[in-house]
C-alpha cells in the first residue's frame, strides 16, 4: 500500500525507478512487482513539483496508482486515454515524457495546467471544464469502429463530474450504439459507495474475467431460447451484483459495471484492467480513491489542499505585506449575507462553487436558502428561473467560464420570461495560470445581446456591492461581472442602496482624449490619464449604455478609448461604436480589450501586459493612436 508522507520535499527526491519510467514505454518494461515502489517515487515527485510551482494538488495524489495501472495495461498513446477536467492529470504528464518540463507548470510558455492536444500526443483531448470525457471517448470509440481500428478508448471521470447531465447523455448514447469503450469512475469522495474491501475486489476480478464474460455470453445464447430461464438467470446475476456493488444504475443504462475496487491497490487494478481491456461493449469500472492520498495533511483536509501555492525558500525573508483590498468574491459573500438578512426572498444558488464563490458563510447562516446543485450549470439557471416565477429572488453565483454552459437556459428560461434572476459572475476576464479554458473572456459579448438584460462592470469593491444591490432590486435579469483577486482597497459602504441604472460617472476631467472604462482597469486608466491629461469615465453599465454621456464625450473630445477585460469583438467597446454609428456620429475610436486569440496561461499581470491592458500598454496604445491622429 502507498507510503504516507508528512512534508512536501524542498529538494528533488531520488527516484531510480521513475528515472527509467518517465514514458509509458519505459513504464511497461518494469516488472509488476516494482510498481508499488514506483508509485511512492511518483508521489514524491508530484509533491516536489507542485511544491515548486503551485497548482492542483489533492486530485493528482489520489490517482497515482490508477495512472500507473492505465499506462501499464493499455498501449497509450495508440489507445486513447481521456481525463475529465484535468486536475488529476499531473502524474499522467510526468509519466508521458514531460517530467523535465514540470517545473514550468502553469507558467508563461510552460506546461499547461490541464491536458492539451498541442502539448503531447498522450493528451488525446483538451479539457478544463468538467463532464466532457465520456462524450469525447465515445466519439473516439465510434471513429475507431468506422476506421476498423482495434485501439481502445478510455474515459476517467470523477464522481463530482458525473453529476452533470452531459455525462449521463453520453452514457445513454454509448449503450445505444454498443460502443467498445471503458469508463472509469474515480470516486474520490466516496459519494456513491463505501462498499470497498476484499470481497468487493475479489468480485470485481471474477466479474471482469474473460472466463466469466465467455460464460455469460454463452449462457445468454442458450437461455435466450428459453425466455423464462434466461429471465431468472439475469435477475439472479443482478441480485448478486446489487448486493455487493452499487452498479444498478449503470447496469440499467446498459453498461457492464465492475467494482467498486480499491484505487490504491495496484495488483487488483492491473488485474481488473487486463480483464476488461478486450471486453466488448460499454464497460464501467468503479474505482474508489482518496483525494490527497499519501500526503497526510491533504488526506485530512482535501478541500484545503485541492490546490496550493508554491513553497517559498525556507531562508527567504518575509516579503512586506502588500496593501490591497478584500477579494471581490469575499465582498460578494458579505453582500449576500447582508441582503439575505434584509430580504427573506433572497436565495443563493451555485454549481459546486461554494468555497470559490465565497458562499460558505451564507450556507451556514441560511442553510434553507442555499442550494448547491453540483456540477449542473444548466439546472442551476433554470432552477433559479422556477424560483423567480414564484416570487423568490435568486442569486446565481457562477464563474464566467461556466456560465457559458448554460447560455440557452439564460435566454430561454430566464430572459425571455423577464424573470428576476441576478447572476453574480465571478472570475470575469483573465484568470491567470489556469489558462484559456477558465478565462472569463466572453461574458460581456454574450450577455449584452440579450434583450432586457442589465449588465454591470464594477471598478472596485464598493462599486461591486452597489451593483449587486442594483441587480437584486431590478425587475428582470441582471448580471454583475467581477474578476478574480483583490480590489484596490476602496472604502466600502455598508448600505444596500442601488445605483441609478444606466448612468456612468466622470472620475477625471481632461481634454481631447476620453478613456471609457468598463471594469477594474479604472486604476490603470487614471495613471495613464495623468500622463496625457485625459478624461476618465467609469462607465459602470454595459447595458443599458449611458448613451447621453457617450454623446457628450464624443462632442467634447477628439478620441474615445474604450477599455475592458473582455473580448474586443462584441464587447462593451463595440456597444459604444454601434451606438455612435446609429447616431451617425463619426468619431475616432480605439478599443482596448482581449484580442481575438486564446491568451495562454501565465501570471495575471503577464497576461494583462501581453494584451496591452496594464498601464504601460494602455498608455502606449493611446499615444500611438494620438500620433496617428496628430493629437
Curated annotation (Swiss-Prot):
One of its GO terms (cellular component) is cytosol. Keywords: Isoprene biosynthesis, Magnesium, Metal-binding, Thiamine biosynthesis, Thiamine pyrophosphate, Transferase. It comes from the Bacteria. Gene3D superfamilies: 3.40.50.920, 3.40.50.970. It catalyses: D-glyceraldehyde 3-phosphate + pyruvate + H(+) = 1-deoxy-D-xylulose 5-phosphate + CO2. Pathway: Metabolic intermediate biosynthesis; 1-deoxy-D-xylulose 5-phosphate biosynthesis; 1-deoxy-D-xylulose 5-phosphate from D-glyceraldehyde 3-phosphate and pyruvate: step 1/1. One of its GO terms (molecular function) is magnesium ion binding. One of its GO terms (biological process) is 1-deoxy-D-xylulose 5-phosphate biosynthetic process. Its cofactor is Mg(2+); thiamine diphosphate. Mg(2+) binds at residues 159, 188. Homodimer. PANTHER family: 1-D-DEOXYXYLULOSE 5-PHOSPHATE SYNTHASE-RELATED (PTHR43322), 1-DEOXY-D-XYLULOSE-5-PHOSPHATE SYNTHASE, CHLOROPLASTIC (PTHR43322:SF5). Catalyzes the acyloin condensation reaction between C atoms 2 and 3 of pyruvate and glyceraldehyde 3-phosphate to yield 1-deoxy-D-xylulose-5-phosphate (DXP). This is 1-deoxy-D-xylulose-5-phosphate synthase. It comes from Pseudomonas putida (strain GB-1). The lineage of its organism: Bacteria, Pseudomonadati, Pseudomonadota, Gammaproteobacteria, Pseudomonadales.
Amino acid at each position: 500500500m502507498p507510503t504516507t508522507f508528512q512534508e512536501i520535499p524542498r529538494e528533488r527526491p531520488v527516484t531510480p525507478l521513475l528515472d527509467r519510467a518517465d514514458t509509458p514505454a519505459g513504464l511497461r518494461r518494469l516488472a509488476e512487482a516494482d510498481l508499488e515502489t514506483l508509485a511512492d517515487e511518483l508521489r514524491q515527485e508530484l509533491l516536489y513539483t507542485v511544491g515548486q510551482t503551485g497548482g492542483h494538488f489533492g486530485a493528482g495524489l489520489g490517482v497515482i496508482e490508477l495512472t500507473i495501472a492505465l499506462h501499464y495495461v493499455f498501449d497509450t498513446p495508440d489507445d486513447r486515454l481521456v481525463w475529465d477536467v484535468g486536475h488529476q492529470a499531473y502524474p499522467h504528464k510526468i509519466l508521458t515524457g514531460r517530467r523535465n518540463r514540470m517545473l514550468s507548470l502553469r507558467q508563461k510558455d510552460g506546461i499547461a495546467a490541464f491536458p492539451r492536444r498541442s502539448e503531447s500526443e498522450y493528451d488525446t483531448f483538451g479539457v478544463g471544464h468538467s463532464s466532457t470525457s465520456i462524450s469525447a471517448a465515445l466519439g473516439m470509440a465510434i471513429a475507431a469502429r468506422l476506421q476498423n481500428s482495434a485501439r481502445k478508448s478510455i474515459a476517467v471521470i470523477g464522481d463530482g463530474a458525473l453529476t452533470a447531465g452531459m455525462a449521463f447523455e453520453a452514457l445513454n448514447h454509448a449503450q445505444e450504439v454498443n460502443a467498445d469503450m471503458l469508463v472509469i469512475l474515480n470516486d474520490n469522495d466516496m459519494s456513491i459507495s463505501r462498499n470497498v474491501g476484499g470481497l468487493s475486489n475479489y468480485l470485481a476480478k471474477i466479474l471482469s474475467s474473460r472466463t466469466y464474460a465467455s460464460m455469460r455470453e454463452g449462457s445468454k445464447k442458450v437461455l435466450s431460447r428459453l425466455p423464462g430461464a434466461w429471465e431468472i438467470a439475469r435477475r439472479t446475476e443482478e441480485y448478486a451484483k446489487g448486493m455487493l456493488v452499487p452498479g444498478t444504475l449503470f447496469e440499467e443504462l446498459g453498461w457492464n459495471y465492475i467494482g467498486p475496487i480499491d484505487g490504491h491497490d495496484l495488483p487488483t487494478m492491473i488485474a481488473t484492467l487486463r480483464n476488461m481491456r478486450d471486453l466488448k461493449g460499454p464497460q464501467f469500472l468503479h474505482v474508489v480513491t482518496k483525494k490527497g492520498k499519501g500526503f497526510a495533511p491533504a488526506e485530512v483536509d482535501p478541500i484545503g489542499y485541492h490546490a496550493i501555492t508554491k513553497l517559498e525558500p525556507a531562508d527567504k525573508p518575509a516579503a512586506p505585506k502588500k496593501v490591497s483590498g478584500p477579494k471581490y468574491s469575499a465582498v460578494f459573500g458579505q453582500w449576500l449575507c447582508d441582503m439575505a438578512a434584509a430580504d427573506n426572498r433572497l436565495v443563493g444558488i451555485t454549481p459546486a462553487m461554494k468555497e470559490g464563490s465565497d458562499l460558505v458563510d451564507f450556507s451556514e447562516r441560511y442553510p434553507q436558502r442555499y442550494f448547491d446543485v453540483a456540477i449542473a450549470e444548466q439546472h442551476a439557471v433554470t432552477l433559479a428561473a422556477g424560483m423567480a416565477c414564484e416570487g423568490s429572488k435568486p442569486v446565481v453565483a457562477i464563474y464566467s467560464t461556466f456560465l457559458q454552459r448554460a447560455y440557452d437556459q439564460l435566454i430561454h428560461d430566464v430572459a425571455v420570461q423577464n424573470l428576476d434572476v441576478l447572476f453574480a459572475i465571478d472570475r470575469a476576464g483573465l484568470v491567470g495560470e489556469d489558462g484559456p479554458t477558465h478565462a472569463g473572456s466572453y461574458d460581456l459579448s454574450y450577455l449584452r445581446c440579450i434583450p432586457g438584460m442589465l449588465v454591470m462592470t464594477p471598478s472596485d469593491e464598493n462599486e461591486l456591492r452597489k451593483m449587486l444591490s442594483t441587480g437584486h432590486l431590478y425587475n428582470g435579469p441582471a448580471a454583475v461581472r467581477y474578476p478574480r483577486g483583490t480590489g484596490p482597497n476602496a472604502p466600502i459602504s455598508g448600505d444596500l442602496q442601488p445605483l441609478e441604472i444606466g448612468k456612468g460617472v466622470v472620475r477625471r476631467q481632461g481634454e481631447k482624449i476620453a478613456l471609457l472604462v468598463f471594469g477594474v482597469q479604472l486604476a490603470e486608466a487614471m495613471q495613464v490619464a495623468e500622463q496625457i491629461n485625459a478624461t476618465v469615465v467609469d462607465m459602470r453599465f454595459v447595458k443599458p449604455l449611458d448613451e447621453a454621456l457617450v454623446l457628450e464625450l464624443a462632442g467634447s473630445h477628439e478620441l474615445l478609448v474604450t477599455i475592458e477585460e473582455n473580448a474586443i469583438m462584441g464587447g462593451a467597446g463595440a456597444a459604444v461604436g454601434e451606438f455612435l454609428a446609429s447616431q451617425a456620429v463619426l468619431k475616432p475610436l480605439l478599443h482596448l480589450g482581449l484580442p481575438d486569440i486564446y491568451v495562454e496561461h501565465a501570471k495575471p499581470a503577464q497576461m494583462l501586459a501581453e494584451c496591452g491592458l496594464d498601464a504601460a500598454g494602455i498608455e502606449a496604445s493611446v499615444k500611438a493612436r494620438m500620433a496617428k491622429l496628430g493629437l
